[in-house]
Structures are given as structure tokens and as C-alpha cells.
């Protein structure tokens, strides 16, 4: 079965957050600036959810010439006073690092009343769990496996949360392209980054997946000190999962990657067995 969000207008995670913001800001007459990094998909959904809303601006950072022309046009042809698109020289990781740096600088973030709709915002992860419950109740199956196209590990981490809530999920399968850090981490324990290569699936052209840190936190027994030390090693590009941690991950996760030739073949040969939900 195929669970497909065909239209950006159906991006419930962003619509939910946008409506939350508008509701609570109307109560206290406050104003916020949303800063978001995108590899293509998040930006389109977030813009559609935030445009024309009162007391909100949205600034979208995308990597210059590293998103698809369709994604760029969806984002950059929106002519609303509260929507600002900014192309950044570099890749998605560079955009994401800028947003993280702004959040860490509390003087700056408070001064501009900054907030976000990336998966930095926990509300977005919670909203994404809805997909999994919808699929389960639509199929009325006893147990499901989910294969999820994965770049920043947000959607599939939401599936992990759904499983922890009690949803009967067997395996969560990370599907990624040749920027394969998540596949290497889950299959071999190798979480060292390489140079990002441009592909035909630019939304997955990411090396360091932010939400993988949340999974590391979980498998370390929710120990923030251990997680902090591990993430310091990640920043030094010197971290490999130990056998115990890898075994914990493999209880819930599997992974696979496709190179560019395999991706093109898949694009041109849709499976007749796909049944949309």
C-alpha cells in the first residue's frame, strides 16, 4: 500500500502548527518570525500553511540550485507580504546549521521573536504521528511495516513515537538515496558524514539528520550527558555506534539505499502493486 501526500495543501503537520500559532498569537497580540530550512518539501508546505496569517512572518532558507525547479517555483512564486524566500550558497545542512545557530543564540532569537516549523519544533513531530495511525486504521491490519523516504529522519522518527505509544508497528524501514549516512548508521553503525552529492531526489540530499539525535537520546536511556558527548563526536565526524546501541536500533529499524541509476529505474517503472490509501 502507498500512503501519498499528493498536495502541499494536505501537509497537515504544517497546517496544524500554523493554526496553533495564529490562534495563540491572536490571544496575546504578539508577533513571531518563523525561520525554516528546507531541502524542498518542508518549505512549500510551511509557506502554504503560514501565508496570509496574521502576526506571522516566514523566512525560508533553501540551498541555491539544489532543490527541484518545481519546488523552487512553488515556494518562490508566492506573493504574500509575510513570505520571504532566501537562497543560500551551500547545501541543506548549511541552511539547517544557520537555523540552529539562530536558535542557540538566545539573545538574537528572543529579540526577533523567533520560532520554527522544522522538526526542531516538537509539535511538528507529534503531528506527523497521525500518518501512521491513519494507515493502521485504514488497513485494519494486526501489524504493519512502514518504508519511509528519509532525509532528516523526522517522518520516520514520528513512526517510532507512534510505536512507542502502542501502535502495532513491526519494522520502520529507512529508504534513502546515495547520501546514505542513515543507511550506514542503521546497517553498520557508521555515523560519519561524507560530502553531500546532488541527486534526482534532492529532499534526501542531507548528511547529518537532525532527528537522529533524538533516537540516540532514546537508546542512551534518555541520558542527556551521554547524548551530548556523542553529538560532540558527531560534530568531529568521529562517531560509530557501539554494538549494544546498534542492536537496540535494529529492533525497530531497517534501512536501504538506492544509487542514481536505481532511482531513475524506479521513477520510470512504477509498481503495479501500489495501492494508494
Regions found by a protein language model. Name each.
Residues 14-26, 49-59, 76-78, 163-169, ...:
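A glycine- and small-aliphatic-rich helix-loop capping segment at beta-alpha/alpha-beta transitions
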Residues 9, 13, 38-44, 122-125, ...:
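Gly/Ser/Thr-rich loops at beta-strand to alpha-helix junctions
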Residues 71-120, 178-269:
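Active-site/ligand-binding loops adjacent to catalytic centers
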Residues 33-47, 52, 156-157, 166-176, ...:
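Active-site histidine-anchored catalytic micro-motif
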Residues 5-9, 13-49:
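Well-ordered mid-protein domain cores that form the structural environment of catalytic cofactors
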Residues 1-8, 12, 267-277:
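Single conserved hydrophobic/aromatic residue that forms the stacking wall/gate
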Residues 61-69:
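Hydrophobic, small-residue-rich alpha-helical packing segments that form membrane-like cores
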Residues 96-101, 106-163:
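Domain-scale recognition of functional cores that engage charged ligands
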Amino acid at each position: 500500500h502507498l500512503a501519498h501526500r499528493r498536495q502541499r495543501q494536505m501537509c497537515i503537520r504544517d497546517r496544524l502548527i500554523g493554526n496553533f500559532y495564529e490562534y495563540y498569537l491572536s490571544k496575546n497580540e504578539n508577533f513571531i518570525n518563523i525561520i525554516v530550512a528546507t531541502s524542498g518539501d518542508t518549505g512549500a508546505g510551511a509557506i502554504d500553511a503560514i501565508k496570509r496569517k496574521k502576526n506571522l512572518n516566514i523566512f525560508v532558507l533553501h540551498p541555491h540550485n539544489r532543490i527541484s525547479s518545481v519546488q523552487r517555483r512553488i515556494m518562490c512564486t508566492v506573493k504574500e507580504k509575510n513570505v520571504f524566500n532566501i537562497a543560500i550558497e551551500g547545501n541543506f545542512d548549511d541552511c539547517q546549521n544557520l537555523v540552529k545557530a539562530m536558535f542557540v543564540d538566545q539573545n538574537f532569537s528572543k529579540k526577533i521573536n523567533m520560532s520554527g516549523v522544522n522538526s526542531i519544533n516538537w509539535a511538528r513531530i507529534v503531528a506527523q504521528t497521525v500518518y501512521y495511525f491513519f494507515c493502521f486504521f485504514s488497513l485494519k491490519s494486526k501489524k504493519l511495516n512502514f518504508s519511509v523516504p528519509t532525509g532528516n529522519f523526522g517522518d520516520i522518527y514520528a513512526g517510532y513515537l507512534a510505536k512507542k505509544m502502542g501502535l502495532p508497528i513491526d519494522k520502520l524501514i529507512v529508504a534513502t538515496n546515495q547520501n546514505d549516512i542513515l543507511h550506514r548508521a542503521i546497517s553498520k553503525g557508521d555515523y560519519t558524514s561524507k560530502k553531500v552529492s546532488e541527486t534526482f531526489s534532492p529532499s534526501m540530499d542531507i548528511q547529518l539528520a537532525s532527528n537522529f539525535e533524538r533516537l540516540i537520546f532514546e537508546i542512551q536511556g534518555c541520558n542527556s550527558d551521554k547524548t551530548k558527548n556523542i553529538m560532540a563526536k558527531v560534530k568531529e565526524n568521529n562517531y560509530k555506534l557501539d554494538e549494544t546501541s546498534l542492536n537496540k536500533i535494529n529492533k525497530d529499524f531497517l534501512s536501504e539505499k538506492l544509487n542514481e541509476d536505481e532511482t531513475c529505474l524506479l521513477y520510470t517503472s512504477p509498481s503495479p502493486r501500489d495501492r494508494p490509501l
